[in-house]
Amino acid sequence: MPSMDIVSEVNEVELRNAVDNSVRELKSRFDFRGKEASIEYKDHVVTLSAEDDFQCQQLVDILRMQMSKRNVDPKSMDVDDKAVHSGKTFSLRVKFKEGIETLIAKKLVKLIKDSKLKVQSSIQGDSVRVTGKKRDDLQAVMALAREADLGQPFQFNNFRD
């Protein structure tokens, strides 16, 4: 009986590469010449700091663009609402969503059940296990999960036949 797990993970290596590319772009951008701005990555948190709130938002856009280039879904970003002002710099903290929260998992299971596909889905910690009789049903669930706008990207692993 085919089964798979629906998870939400961020590829650590690709994320680090995206941050490094963002730092490189920051150093070469003309509008940041002579300005004090930085992008730092530590313990699954990216800290963006700049002299102005507008520049912090530009740094977020740079990071999003580089993440897209490295195939890391920007939906996994959880950006602070307001930049923290300390001294002469503004800083934003960007955290990344790991695992599927219980509320989102319940919505996903309900979405799968409402689709009338012949599959069973169950919440297992921070992932959702889906089993069905046919591989085509699981592929339909994959398409359904990708289309669903639940504010979080999903990956599929442990696909067994």
Swiss-Prot record:
Xref: Pfam families: DUF520
Presence of the UniProt keyword Nucleotide-binding in the record: yes
Keywords: Nucleotide-binding
One Gene Ontology cellular component annotation held by this UniProt entry: cytosol
InterPro entries found in the cross-reference section: DUF520, UPF0234-like_C, UPF0234_N, YajQ-like_sf
Keyword match Transmembrane: no
A single MF term (Gene Ontology): nucleotide binding
Disulfide cysteine pairs (residue numbers): none
Superkingdom of origin: Bacteria
Function: Nucleotide-binding protein.
Entry similarity comment: Belongs to the YajQ family.
Name the UniProt record assigns to this protein: Nucleotide-binding protein swp_1151
